[in-house]
């Protein structure tokens, strides 16, 4: 039984994510040979890459940003190892990331949030045959598939402390935070979850 089939039963059906505007590459304008903040924001940010098992192809991601919308969009590209035949194989308003080659290089696995939460998908190296593999009740933040394709290690957030609503079920809309000890970090947010590995 594949890891995808095992995880399919981990959660219920997700609500479809809202379609946002597609954020694509912007024209970079350099005036007077000076790099400006606008030019920097127009550049795509290259993400993680994966080399195919035969060493002939490279899959990688690029994020494009929209300053007015204050958000980004990440897409998957595939090219030959020598840099030729560079092609964008996804074009969606969602986030595609953590791309890797599976099934001997015949498929690409990746994470996407197009159904409202980050789940594992697969597709052909040309972008066709997109298929959701997991239906985990939460966001998958990272993963690794065993060489035989039968086991999946994935990372997801788990609660580290009870929330106010957990402690007081009769106050489900309460948003206050009860502090009984000193903070142990200087960051500007309350840490209520932590990354945890799971195996399926």
Go through the PLM ranges and name each one:
Residues 6-9:
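C-terminal motif of bacterial Sec signal peptides marking the signal peptidase cleavage site
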Residues 11-13:
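Bacterial signal peptide processing site
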Residues 16-23, 157-200:
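Predominantly five- to eight-bladed beta-propeller fold
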Residues 22-45, 71, 79-97, 112, ...:
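Multi-bladed beta-propeller domains
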Residues 38-74:
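Beta-strand-rich domains and repeat architectures in extracellular enzymes and scaffolds
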Residues 55-59, 89, 105-109, 133, ...:
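Hydrophobic beta-strand positions that form the internal "hydrophobic ladder"
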Residues 59-66, 108-115, 153-159, 188-191:
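Beta-strand C-termini and the immediately following turn/loop, strongest in propeller blades
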């Amino acid at each position: 039984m594949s890891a995808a089939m095992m995880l399919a039963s981990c959660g219920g059906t997700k609500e479809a994510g809202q379609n946002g505007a597609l954020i694509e590459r912007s024209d970079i304008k350099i005036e007077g040979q000076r790099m400006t903040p606008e030019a920097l924001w127009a550049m795509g940010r290259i993400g993680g890459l994966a080399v195919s098992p035969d060493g002939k192809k490279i899959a990688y991601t690029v994020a494009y940003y929209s300053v007015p919308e204050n958000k980004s969009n990440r897409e998957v590209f595939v090219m030959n190892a020598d840099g030729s035949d560079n092609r964008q194989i996804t074009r969606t308003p969602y986030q595609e990331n953590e791309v890797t080659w599976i099934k001997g290089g015949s498929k690409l696995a990746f994470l996407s949030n197009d159904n409202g939460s980050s789940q594992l998908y697969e597709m052909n190296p040309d972008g066709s045959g997109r298929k959701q593999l997991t239906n985990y009740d939460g966001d998958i933040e990272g993963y690794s598939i065993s060489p035989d394709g039968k086991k999946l290690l994935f990372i997801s957030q788990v609660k580290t402390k009870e929330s106010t609503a957990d402690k007081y079920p009769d106050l489900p809309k309460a948003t206050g935070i009860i502090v009984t000890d000193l903070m142990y970090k200087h960051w500007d947010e309350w840490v209520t979850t932590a990354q945890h590995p799971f195996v399926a």
